[in-house]
Amino acid sequence: MSLYEHVFIARQDLSNAQAEGLIEHFSTVLADNGGKVVDREYWGVKTMAYKINKNRKGHYAFLKSDAPSAAVQEMERLMRLHDDVMRVLTIKVDKHAEGPSIQMQKRDERERGDRGDRSDRGDRGDRGDRGGFRR
């Protein structure tokens, strides 16, 4: 079996639960056809660079799978027929990256709010004279 990564975009008017239901549905399709989902991530609603089917935003989902090509083709066929799925991208990879995807790492950094460049400021004595008003 081969390793694949899939990203799909669902319509923006779906609820989060419905979007995650789509992830579960397509994972089941892979499993029914002899494959397995190694990892799945729901990236949330993101703004797209251009409109797709009159939608400016969409629910993004990411799947890592280990499946035969027939299972992947069947899942892609069903995704393209599904009214709620706007775009599908599947790539074959040599191996899956460990840990969360780059998108999830970015989200974690953003939610944490921890700025690494703030701890070394101290009392900000490195600013020097800023040409303040003097009499």
From Swiss-Prot:
Residues 96-135 are annotated as: Disordered. It comes from Cereibacter sphaeroides (strain ATCC 17029 / ATH 2.4.9). This is Small ribosomal subunit protein bS6. Belongs to the bacterial ribosomal protein bS6 family. Residues 105-135 have a biased composition (Basic and acidic residues). Coiled coil: none annotated. It comes from the Bacteria. Binds together with bS18 to 16S ribosomal RNA. HAMAP family: Ribosomal_bS6 (MF_00360). GO terms for biological process: translation. One of its GO terms (molecular function) is structural constituent of ribosome. The gene is rpsF. Keywords: Ribonucleoprotein, Ribosomal protein, RNA-binding, rRNA-binding. InterPro entries: Ribosomal_bS6, Ribosomal_bS6_sf, Ribosomal_S6_plastid/chlpt, Transl_elong_EF1B/ribsomal_bS6. One of its GO terms (cellular component) is cytosolic small ribosomal subunit. Disulfide bonds: none annotated.
